[in-house]
Amino acid sequence: MREICRSFQHLPGHPPSNAQWKIPLFLRDRRTLEPTVHWLVENSTAIIDMGNDIVLDRDGRSFVRVRYDSELYHDIIARLHSDANCIPVAARTRLMDDSFTLAEIGNLSYAHALNISVYLRKETAYPPVKMLHAHLDFLVSRLTAHPQFSKFQVRL
C-alpha cells in the first residue's frame, strides 16, 4: 500500500495559486492487470495498492510530475538494474523526465535523478536515452558559466 499526496511547487516569477483540481492516478487492477483510474480529489491523500507495479502511470498518460520517496526511488533503481523491462518504456521515459525536471526546480536531489539514469547502459529503447540527453544538455548549458566548468567537462 502506498500513500499518494499532492504537493505544489511554485516557480519564481509566477504568482502563487491555491487552485486545486482532481488528479487521475493511472494504475492497473491487481488481479486483472487492466488499466484503472483512481482520482485524487482536492485536499486529500489516497492509499492505493499498486500490486507488483512500482511506478504510477505505466503508460505515461498523466499531466503531473511524480515524485517518489527515497525508499521507492531506491527500489525503482534496483529493479531497473536487474531488469529494465519490468517498467514499460513510457514509464521509464517519464521517470527520467520527472526526476530531472524535479531536480532542476530544486524539488528532488540530482543524486536521485543521476542514479536513476545509470541503468541506461542496459537500455535498449531510444526514448529514455533521448530524454536523458535533453536534460543533460540543459544541465550543461546552465553549468557553462561556472568557473569550475572545465573540470566537469573533462568528465563528459
Question: Which role does the model predict for each range below?
Answer:
Residues 1-156:
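Non-catalytic accessory/interaction domains
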